[in-house]
């Protein structure tokens, strides 16, 4: 008798697969639209599961919110937010008011969504240009892709602190374990071909062998490995590279 494979168990959403959100201070997002004024950095904290430091900011009206800390931000620094905010490191500006060439992070895709782009440690986006007639701002994302976003959206000036974190090696498997635990990742991951046949479609046999591509319409439990792929192997990669050229 077979058993449910790992991807099926993960899809069910058991407690061991859920992200431990109760360990976090709260959502990292901007205050409601229309919020403007000055504030200051109350504290810079570490939040389990996030790969960048988080700044706790308190505004003049008493409202507090969490935002990713900019490189060089310090406790007690004055922060401006709104249309009148100057493009200084740590300030939350409206994209339509940001000068061309400004480095920003935690960029909103739609006004009021709290920030969607450039949120990882050490990343930033660049304001490339403005389209006032269409109320759009052109932003170059960390991937190099340019995107038009609503000019009424907000972003923080600077780059996210915590850059270079991936340059430090893990060294021990135990560190990887605790990193995965903070993010609710399954660790260690066992290869399907190393399992028994009752546990995975790639398991079993007197020797290990690769699986075959699976149809997109295959039922859950069969959908592992290459799903609906047109071609596989080294020749496939070469063919795609030639097509791009």
UniProtKB/Swiss-Prot annotation:
UniProt keywords (A-Z) are: Ribonucleoprotein, Ribosomal protein, RNA-binding, rRNA-binding
GO MF entries = rRNA binding; structural constituent of ribosome
- Entry GO CC: cytosolic large ribosomal subunit
Q: Tell me which Pfam families the record gives.
A: Ribosomal_L2, Ribosomal_L2_C
Q: Where is this region: Disordered?
A: 196-226
Of which family is this protein a member?
Belongs to the universal ribosomal protein uL2 family.
The record's HAMAP family line, in alphabetical order, gives: Ribosomal_uL2_A (MF_01320_A)
Q: What does this protein do?
A: One of the primary rRNA binding proteins. Required for association of the 30S and 50S subunits to form the 70S ribosome, for tRNA binding and peptide bond formation. It has been suggested to have peptidyltransferase activity; this is somewhat controversial. Makes several contacts with the 16S rRNA in the 70S ribosome.
* PANTHER family according to UniProt: LARGE RIBOSOMAL SUBUNIT PROTEIN UL2 (PTHR13691:SF16), RIBOSOMAL PROTEIN L2 (PTHR13691)
- According to UniProt, the name of this protein is Large ribosomal subunit protein uL2
User: Which gene is transcribed and translated to give this protein?
Assistant: rpl2
């Amino acid at each position: 008798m077979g058993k449910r494979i790992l991807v099926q168990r993960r899809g069910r959403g058991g407690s061991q697969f859920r992200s431990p959100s109760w360990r976090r201070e709260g959502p990292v997002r901007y205050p409601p639209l229309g919020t403007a004024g000055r504030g200051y950095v109350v504290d810079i904290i570490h939040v389990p599961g996030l790969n960048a430091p988080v700044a706790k900011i308190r505004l003049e009206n008493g409202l507090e919110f969490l935002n990713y800390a900019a490189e060089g931000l310090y406790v007690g620094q004055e922060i401006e937010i709104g249309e009148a905010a100057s493009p200084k490191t740590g300030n939350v500006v409206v994209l339509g008011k940001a000068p061309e060439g400004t480095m920003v992070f935690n960029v909103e895709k739609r006004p009021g969504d709290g920030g969607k782009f450039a949120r990882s440690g050490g990343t930033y986006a660049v304001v490339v240009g403005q389209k006032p007639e269409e109320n759009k701002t052109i932003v170059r994302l960390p991937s190099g892709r340019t995107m038009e976003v609503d000019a009424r959206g907000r972003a923080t000036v600077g780059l996210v602190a915590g850059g270079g974190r991936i340059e430090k090696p893990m060294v021990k498997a135990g560190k990887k374990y605790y990193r995965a635990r903070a993010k609710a990742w399954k660790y260690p991951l066992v290869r399907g071909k190393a399992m028994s046949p009752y546990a995975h479609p790639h398991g079993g046999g007197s020797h290990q062998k690769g699986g075959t591509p699976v149809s997109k319409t295959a039922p859950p439990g069969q959908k592992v490995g290459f799903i609906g792929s047109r071609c596989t192997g080294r020749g496939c990669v070469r063919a795609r590279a030639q097509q791009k050229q």
